Amino acid sequence: MTPPLPARDDDRPELSLEDKFTVDEGIIHLTGVQALVRLPLVQRRLDLAAGLNTATFISGYPGSPLGGYDLELQRRRKLLEAHHVVHQMGVNEELGATAVMGSQLAMQLPGPRYDGVLGLWYGKANGFDRAMDSLRQANLAGTVRTGGALALVGDDPTAKSSPTPGASEVAAAAIMMPMLYPGDVQEVLDLGQHAVALSRSCGLWVALKMSTTVADGSGSAFVAPGRVQPVMVDIDLDGKPYVHRPSTHMYGARVMEMEHSLVYGRMRAALAYARANDVNRITLRGDNDRIGIVSTGKTYFEMRQTLRELGLDDRELQRLGVRLLQVRMPYPLEGRIVREFAEGLSEILVLEDKRPFVELFVKDELYGLPDRPLVLGKLDENGTWLVPIHAELDTVSIAKLVADRLLKRAAPGELPALQERLERITRPRSLAPLAMSRTPYFCSGCPHNSSVAGVPTGTVVGAGTGCHVLAVFMRPDEVGDILGITAMGNEGAQWIGASPFSSMSHLLQNLGDGTYAHSGSLAIRAAVSAGVNITYKLLYNDHVAMTGAQPAI
C-alpha cells in the first residue's frame, strides 16, 4: 500500500505549471522553446512598468527545432491573451514574415490601440532562407522605438529533422539583420530581452539563433525584474540625431535613403548597443596570456565543459596563459572587444560550427594591426583543415583542438595529465549491439500507412517533405522506387526538368496536405503549365507531426 503524502505546509507557496511563465523572481525550470514563450509576457510587464501600453504579434511557420513553439503558444493561449499577445500562424514562412512586418506599421494607421507592438517571427533555418525576400524588405522597412521585431530562427546543424543542415548566420548577414546567439536557457531569457531592446534602439529586426540543443534542451534559470537592464542607444546619421520611422514606400530615391539609414545609421547603432551592454564578453584573462579562444552560442558552453573534462579550470587556464572570449552577438561583430581581446596574444583559435563566420570578422578586425596574433579556425597555420566545417562541434572534437594547441606550446612532458585526459575523452567506445533493428515507420492509425502503399512494382515515386518521407526507408515493392525529395512545396517540379531527357513517361508524386496548403499548390500549377505527365497523390492526415502538428488545411 502506498503511504499517504505528508501534510502540506501551508506556508509554502502554491506551485503551478505556469510558474515558469509568471514568476517574476526566483529560479525556474523550462525548455528553450518555453523561454521564447515567456519572452513576450515579460516584455509586456516591463513595458507597463515603464509606462508603455504594448502588445505582441507572433506569426511564422513551425519547423524543428522550433516545431513545438506554436503548440506551446496554443497551450498558454489564455495567459497570452491576458498579456495582449496575438498568435496567428502563417500559411508559410514568407507570409508570416510580412504579417510581422505589418505589426511595425500599425502605429501609423488611424486609431492605434497601443503605444507599440512587438513582432515575433518564427521558423527553422530552411524557412528563414525561404522567407529571405520578405525578411529583407521587412528589415529595410525597420521597426518602431516602442515595438521591435525579432526573427526566432531554429538551426538544425546536423539535420536531425531537416532535409539539409542549418546555419542561419550568413543569411542574416546578407540582409544586414543583427543576430544574437544564446547558448543555454538562461541566455535565451537574457538575450531575448536584449534582442527586443536592440531592435527598438537600432530600428532593425534582430535574429535570435536557436540551435537544436538549446531549443529542445531544458535547464534552470534565474529570473528577476532587474536582471537585464538594457542601455538604449540613439541613432546618429550624417552627424545628426536620427529617429527611424518604419516605411514600406520602397521605390525610387526613397529606397536609397532607407538603405543609407540602414548602413550608416541603424547598423552603427547596433554596434553601439553591443558595446554599451557588454553583449560580447571576455570571460577569462590573466597577466601573461598568449593563447585566445573565441567561441559562440552553445559551442562556448560545450567548450567550457570540455575544458573542465580536460582538467583545465580557470586557475589552470590562467597558468597556461589562456584567454576566453564569448561572442553572443556574432553579427555585426563589435570590433573594439575583439581588439581588446587580441592585445598581447600570439595565437587565437576560433571555435564555431559550419563555415567560417566570426573567424572572418576577427581576421578583418585585426588585419591592419602591426602586432597581430595568428588567427586559426577552419585552417591551421599550414593551410590544412583544423576546425571541422561540417556537422557540429562536440566534446571530442573540441578536446582534440584545444589540447593539441596547448600541447604544441608546452615543453615535452609538461602536461602529462592533459594528454591522459585527452586520450580518455577521445577513446573509441564500443556500443552494445541492438537486439532488433527498428526501421522508422508511420504512427499506428495514420492514413499514410495505406495511402503511401499499394504502388505497382517498378513505379517511380517522388517523395516529399513531411511524415510520408519515411517511405524512403520502406520496401520498393510496397511504396515504389523512391526518387528522392525536393525543397518543401516544390514536389514534382523536378520532373519538369527531367522529363525531356528521359524515356520514362510518367511520375507519381507524393504531396502532403500540410505542404499543399503551405506552397505545394504552386508546384501543381507549374506541372500543369509545363504540360508534363505527372500524377499527384495528395496524402491527407490533418497533421504535420514531424514538425509542428498544426492543422494542415
Residue ranges with predicted function:
Residues 35-51, 61-74:
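N-terminal glycine-rich anion-binding loops that anchor highly charged ligand groups
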Residues 47, 53-60, 447-463:
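Carboxylate/His-rich catalytic cores and anion/metal-binding grooves
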Residues 71-76, 164-168, 307, 361-366, ...:
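Short, aromatic/basic amphipathic alpha-helical patches
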